[in-house]
Amino acid sequence: MTGQLIQYGRHRKRRSYARISEILELPNLIEIQTKSYDWFLKEGLIEMFKDISPIEDFTGNLSLEFVDYKLGEPKYDLDESKNRDATYAAPLRVKVRLIIKETGEVKEQEVFMGDFPLMTDTGTFVINGAERVIVSQLVRSPSVYFNDKVDKNGKVSFGATVIPNRGAWLEYETDAKDVVFVRIDRTRKLPITVLLRALGFSTDQEIIDLLGDNEYLRNALDKDNTESTEAALLEIYERLRPGEPPTVENAKSLLYSRFFDPKRYDLASVGRYKMNKKLHLKHRLFNQVLAEPIVNTETGEIVAEEGTLLDRRNLDQIIDVLESNANQKVYDLDNGLLDEPIEIQSVKVYVPGDEEKRTTTIIGNAFPDDEVKCITPADILSSVSYFFNLLAGVGFTDDIDHLGNRRLRSVGELLQNQFRIGLSRMERVVRERMSLQDTESVTPQQLINIRPVIASIKEFFGSSQLSQFMDQANPLAELTHKRRLSALGPGGLTRERAGMEVRDVHYSHYGRMCPIETPEGPNIGLINSLSSYARVNEFGFIETPYRKVDIETNTVTSQIDYLTADEEDAYVVAQANARLDDNGKFLDDEVVCRFRGDNTVMARERMDYMDVSPKQVVSAATACIPFLENDDSNRALMGANMQRQAVPLMNPEAPFVGTGMEHVAARDSGAAVVAKYKGRVEHVEARQIKVRRIVEEGGKEIETDLDVYKLAKFARSNSGTCYNQRPIVEAGNIVTKGEILADGPSMELGEMALGRNVVVGFMTWDGYNYEDAVIMSERLVKDDVYTSIHIEEYESEARDTKLGPEEITRDIPNVSDNALKNLDDRGIIFVGAEVRDGDILVGKVTPKGVTELTAEERLLHAIFGEKAREVRDTSLRVPHGADGIVLDVKVFNREDGDELPPGVNQLVRVYIVQKRKIHVGDKMCGRHGNKGVISRILPEEDMPFMPDGTPIDIMLNPLGVPSRMNIGQVLELHLGMAAKNLGLHVASPVFDGANDEDVWSTIEEAGMARDGKTVLYDGRTGEPFDNRVSVGVMYMLKLAHMVDDKLHARSTGPYSLVTQQPLGGKAQFGGQRFGEMEVWALEAYGAAYTLQEILTYKSDDTVGRVKTYEAIVKGENIPRPGVPESFRVLMKELQSLGLDVKVMDNKDEEIEMRDLEDDDFVDSKINIAKAPMPEAEITE
């Protein structure tokens, strides 16, 4: 026997074929959401209030500070919020201090700042009763970036961009004549020396002394027309504010506000970190030859001589001096911009490979503090210096697709940015109110207007591209949605602009972003998934764990280091499957490893780190595909995506062949009920589980509080599927923290169970599995193997109209008693009633418009109390194809104190449940991207059967395997059969699972033929088929694309207003489009009359439609068709262009184009007004 038994949860053991032991537990998979939101509540909010405090009025007399805040108790708990369509939120109260400087008076007050949405334990928000997820956004990190491009003549030109978190961009570039230019905030370009002069380096000589003499600088100076700092400032002002009269003072304040004002320009802590990393001397002198000595400025001691090559060893020796004060220069420039002098470090080095021994000056920004969130003049000088160094061949360009240069904005930061917008709008209002209010009587409450804050938060949760309606089709869909990374959204990319490079897999994605799981279509590569072990650091960079290798002893230690993408670039990383002895030493002299983008073989002494696990490369969904290593990546992508579309079945079953990931994914998805503390189960029932908490004190275990866990029963999920939880523990069980107490939808015994294990044969059958179609046995229908439960919600509201209130009632005009038989006395359907399309769910009448009554009529009305005015029937009816059983009815009344939208008096919600068996036309798939549509469901007796008489369940086309290269499905098939025969579940983790030898030996252990094939007999004749067939057990899922949702037919229905043609699509109850090519087909057959009626009566001949309907009702001959409406639209279009268009008959007489008139119906015996007419609806 190969493999060892491993316990997953309380109930499931699997035989695992893994060879590599788990060094590191998988982290909590939704930590990316919860951790970020916790940060926001603990630190993010405080940071915001600090940024905006104090708000001072224009005279500087009043000052408003935000001191502290606290969150109250939510108004409704989670379940109540969902029921009432409310937002799960807590009131935010802020302590505000108002200081009046004239009198020294201080007023403190607590101000309510609106309700703040809270995150649930499972990482979601409940907004207006619906669960939503905030997707993390991948954006370019603020920093300075250098790039190069080659023009058509082969000339290399460089560019640089300083990108802040918010504020003006600064760009450097060279042109064809080798002049270096600068652009400030995307305006017209200026010679770079203009910016240096504006900073205070007024003469040419000062600039040359600063940056070193070179041809590029000389070219820029030649192009520069300014002579002094003042002239340079005016030049910049004219570019940024064309048309305004420039003055030196205005120019100074403009330049200051663009770059040096913390309120307008923000690098954020991440930008400062990246900037220092890029521009500091210690990162730039590596492998350079010094052209001047490096001197400790304080002591005057020379720490490195001229001509020294600074390799890693030499650099390490002088790094302390570099970090403190090596070659420090201080420029005290009287430029009126900033008071502090500019501190820089500058070192001359030789240009590499230059025969004339030319030098270039490297200027480093002398260690600005991490607290400085603005750009400093030293940063600008060192970035300009880096640019000139690049032109001389010193330094590196950046790869913007590298994950070291892209960071994540998670929930917390996105919320903070949104909150900041609200606060800055509020700040404006506060300032205005300060100047209007009376200083004596003013209070903080009067100054603060919380509307803009509430509005910006509401807008973010309600309509931001990153706030999405949670995909709740099954637990995996839920989990994946919370771990999604999107490059789209505000401040990100757009689909149209994103090129191939951004979408491509990059080597830095390894262990951070899944290379497999991404949507097909226009979003490919822009929406990704976080890898299974990855986490996000304080700066928003994605880190992945590695095992540290001890350099001296060359052994792999148990120390785990989390590295970001740019840190990893410095190290050599061995793969997780490198062979180790018991002490952690590498067994092979040469080890397969990665260094930057290369996969190579290196000596074992060169290893710095080792992978933690083979599955750290892929995401949670991809890690659920067994034998992933044997599948082509395109098909694996489909497999990972289709698992998310699996419909929860009525009787779920975990896969025989799993990967060991099923338990973790189910536990962290939020669909299961998980124990929050260690305890003993006291009581179990369908709707709740009670657990007595156990706490350790002084080495003894003491029982304390009782925790009650509520279970969801037959609720409706966001995707309209049935959300039901079932207990899997018994009273008396001792449960640990994080153990699963109850299965959610698509779970079995604490493991994810998206589909069912079925017996599959790879064979054709009369051509019914042509083009990936699936043939299925009727047993799967009879035994409810693929039956799922769907719940749809319908609502009807009674509003106030201009003519009076609508009324929910049983008394509906022109409706038979039979149609009302299932309504109660209020006019609402009974729970448990079986309904078909067109049945009334909620009876409702709306007052009809009546002519204004005369005084006499009003008097008679008042005296005799005549029957009330006319009403029309606006009842809620069951839409097409939604038959089922009424599961639940919820009624909300304004009178009972329920919160309803304005103008609504009563709201009724009806839930209808359907039990859907599997059908011809439903879509099925395996986990390897092998998808198909059911083409035929055969009686059990016609299915091929095995020698022992067992009929198989499903036949798949063998031609679906070779060209698609997803061989994983075949290995799963064989191993699944062996597992079924042995009565066990197996785990084959990705990239470390069963190899073919394991599969064959397990097959032999199960007593099967070693090739996994068997003789099959034709169920119709009893004869054996010519060849032996691969038969085994495969895990197959039923997908959300069900034929019931797609099949659609129309008799008459709504028409488009302008063209009068039927609408399209099932949702609009539309028709089938008979397009240009279909017209050609009928023309080719000469079917003139058929074509004429399709283009007239059945489409947009408005008069003919009505006349035809009338003729059919009366049983008369169909009249001749008239002119289609679209022809009239064409005529009107031409007339609107000033062309006089008339239509003549064959006698050259004009044909009148007329509208449909009421007198067309005068002679008809049938009351057209009462007949169900084709209605025109406003839909354009």
UniProtKB/Swiss-Prot annotation:
Reaction it catalyzes: RNA(n) + a ribonucleoside 5'-triphosphate = RNA(n+1) + diphosphate
One cellular component (GO) term of this entry: DNA-directed RNA polymerase complex
One GO BP: DNA-templated transcription
Pfam families: RNA_pol_Rpb2_1 (PF04563), RNA_pol_Rpb2_2 (PF04561), RNA_pol_Rpb2_3 (PF04565), RNA_pol_Rpb2_45 (PF10385), RNA_pol_Rpb2_6 (PF00562), RNA_pol_Rpb2_7 (PF04560)
InterPro entries xref list: DNA-dir_RNA_pol_bsu_external_1, DNA-dir_RNA_pol_su2, DNA-dir_RNAP_su2_dom, DNA-dir_RNAP_su2_hyb_sf, RNA_pol_bsu_bac, RNA_pol_bsu_CS, RNA_pol_bsu_protrusion, RNA_pol_Rpb2_2
Keyword Transferase: yes
Alphabetical UniProt keywords: DNA-directed RNA polymerase, Nucleotidyltransferase, Transcription, Transferase
SUPFAM superfamilies assigned to the protein according to its UniProt record, in alphabetical order: beta and beta-prime subunits of DNA dependent RNA-polymerase
Enzyme category, top tier: transferase
Enzyme Commission number(s): 2.7.7.6
A GO MF term: DNA-directed RNA polymerase activity
UniProt KW Transcription keyword: yes
Function: DNA-dependent RNA polymerase catalyzes the transcription of DNA into RNA using the four ribonucleoside triphosphates as substrates.
Family annotation (PANTHER family): DNA-DIRECTED RNA POLYMERASE I SUBUNIT 2
NCBIfam families in UniProt: PRK00405.1, rpoB
Similarity comment: family membership: Belongs to the RNA polymerase beta chain family.
Quaternary structure, from the entry: The RNAP catalytic core consists of 2 alpha, 1 beta, 1 beta' and 1 omega subunit. When a sigma factor is associated with the core the holoenzyme is formed, which can initiate transcription.
Protein name: DNA-directed RNA polymerase subunit beta
Organism of derivation: Macrococcus caseolyticus (strain JCSC5402)
